[in-house]
Amino acid sequence: KRGGSVADIAILVINVLRGFEAQTFECVEILKARKTPFLVAANMIDRVPGWNSYPDTPFSKSYPLQDPYVREDLDNRIYDVIGAFSRLGFKIDRFDKVREFASTVAVVPMSAKTGEGIHELLMVLIGLTQQHLKKRLQTTEGPAKGTVLEVKEDPGLGLTLNTIIYDGTLQKNELIVVGGKEKPIV
């Protein structure tokens, strides 16, 4: 919820073998409520039974090299995902069939493990970002304001904060103040 509440754009990663799960619905509701543009990464295509992986290859190149029954299996899994989104009121299709990206959510089949489809995922993300955020992306002067997503201890670095700065700038060695449970932390 924390990341979804401040995100300008999102990639919703779905395990193509499992389809929609409980957390998928939760994420979709957050994105819908915030009107956050997003695309869907249908991950783990390399785990579809019979899939022959071609590492770091665009999906559009590895897909035609698969046996027909494997392509049909993957298509059915993707259309199950598309159907679930359609029932929630979204216009959605596989990225290579989308005609109007402004009004249609794109599904990009990919594998984080083998790198297949990452090329198309980045292309769609860049296009979506340019389309939806062109007027919103700007640098503002002044003190940084942001949202802390996570606080953790990193070996060699010490205490680290993962944040999203949404206003102003933050410079190296600059003093920051974070709201703590009982009092501000400097």
Which positions does each model-derived feature cover?
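Short, glycine/charged-enriched secondary-structure capping and boundary segments
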Residues: R2-G4, F25-V28, S53-T57, M123
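Hydrophobic alpha-helical scaffolding
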Residues: I14-L17, D67-D75, M110-G115, T163
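Switch/connector loops and helix/strand junctions flanking conserved nucleotide-binding motifs
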Residues: E21-A22, R47-D56, E116-E120, I185-V186
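Alpha-helical scaffold elements adjacent to nucleotide-binding pockets in ATP/GTP-utilizing enzyme cores
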Residues: Q23-I30, R77-A84, E120-L128
